[in-house]
Structure formats: C-alpha cells, structure tokens
C-alpha cells in the first residue's frame, strides 16, 4: 500500500517513513527512505560495478545531477506533469486551465530535456558509465514516456532517448519495470 495524491499516507507507510513518502527500502530489518540515500546504500552493499565515480570532478558531477534530479526534474516531470496527467480524467484533461498548465510544464520539460540531452552526449549523465543519477533520472523518463505527449518530447532529446533504451535493456531495470495501469 502506497500513498496516492489527494489521500493521506497509509499507517503502514508512516511506520516505515514518518514523512509518508515513497520510495522506502527494506533490507532485512533495516529501513531507509529517500532516493539518493537508497541508491548509495545499494551501491555500498550489493555486488556489481560501482555506481559512484572515484575521481573528484566526476563525483562532484554525480552530486550535481543527483541534486538536479531531486530539485528540478522530479518536480517538473513527476510532481507537476506525470501525476496530474495520470490522475486527470477526460473532463479534467479538456479543462482550459489544466491544458494551459500542462502546456507550460511541457515547455519546461522540453528545456529540462535539452539540458539533459547535452549531459547524455557521452552516453550517461556523468560520462561513459552508468551512475547513481542515471538510476534516479531514467525512471522519471520511463513515466514521462508513458504519458500523452511524452514520447514526442523525447524525440527532441535523442541522447536521453538512447540512454533510456539502454537503461530499459539493463537486467536490473527489466526486473523492476513498474507496471502502469491500462488507464493510459
């Protein structure tokens, strides 16, 4: 049971995250919330290639893109576009105010994608290897791509679209692919 917009968090969610938000990681008896913390924990505790660069400049870029993902991309893509689009019924989607707001967000997301596209020119956001910010950004791209107008936005960001294709082909991504309801 997770929270949905317009509804209070469930008691179950509040027991594991007092802020009532997802994601939450449960690993044995250990519970951790907040995406960046979860990603770092996964990197530190599970086998596989490191997801954090060791070189100081690359590590700083990683931290920059983690911040961008949390403070710009998540609000723009998820909070102000995907969630409203997902929960809007046909009547709401035809409402002029809603349409205006979604058009404004589309413009903002197109700008975000143009910035991301330049960053993804070398393959991944921090260069030629998959890192923690990619773990945070690509699921947002997944949800954007599932929304009306999302695939069209990605056309103007070919490097992001290519990274998204490669991300979806990763075993870890395929095993955790979120199912979207047929509503869309």
Report the location of each language-model feature:
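Residue-level signal for nonpolar/aromatic packing positions in well-ordered secondary structure
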Residues: 25, 38, 62, 116, ...
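C-terminal helix/juxtamembrane-tail motif
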Residues: 181-184
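GST-like domain detector, emphasizing the conserved glutathione-binding G-site
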Residues: 1-100
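Residues at helix-coil transition
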Residues: 43-47, 121, 169
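Residue-level recognition of oxygen-bearing side chains
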Residues: 37, 159, 172
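Charged phosphate-binding loop/patch that engages nucleotide di/tri-phosphates or the phosphate backbone
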Residues: 176
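GST-like fold's C-terminal all-alpha helical module
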Residues: 71-168
């Amino acid at each position: 049971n997770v929270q949905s917009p317009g509804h209070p968090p469930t008691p179950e969610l509040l027991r594991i995250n007092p802020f009532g938000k997802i994601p939450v990681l449960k690993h044995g008896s250990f519970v951790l919330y907040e995406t960046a913390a979860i990603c770092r924990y996964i990197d530190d505790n599970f086998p596989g290639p490191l997801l954090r660069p060791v070189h100081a400049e690359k590590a700083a870029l990683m931290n920059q893109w983690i911040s961008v993902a949390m403070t710009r991309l998540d609000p723009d893509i998820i909070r102000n576009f995907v969630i409203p689009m997902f929960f809007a019924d046909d009547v709401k989607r035809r409402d002029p105010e809603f349409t205006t707001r979604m058009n404004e967000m589309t413009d903002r997301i197109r700008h975000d994608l143009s910035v991301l596209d330049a960053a993804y020119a070398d393959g991944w956001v921090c260069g030629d290897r998959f890192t923690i910010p990619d773990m945070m950004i690509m699921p947002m791209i997944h949800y954007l791509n599932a929304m009306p107008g999302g695939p069209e936005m990605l056309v103007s960001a070919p490097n992001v679209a290519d990274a998204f294709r490669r991300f979806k082909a990763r075993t870890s991504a395929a095993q955790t692919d979120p199912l979207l309801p047929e509503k869309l």
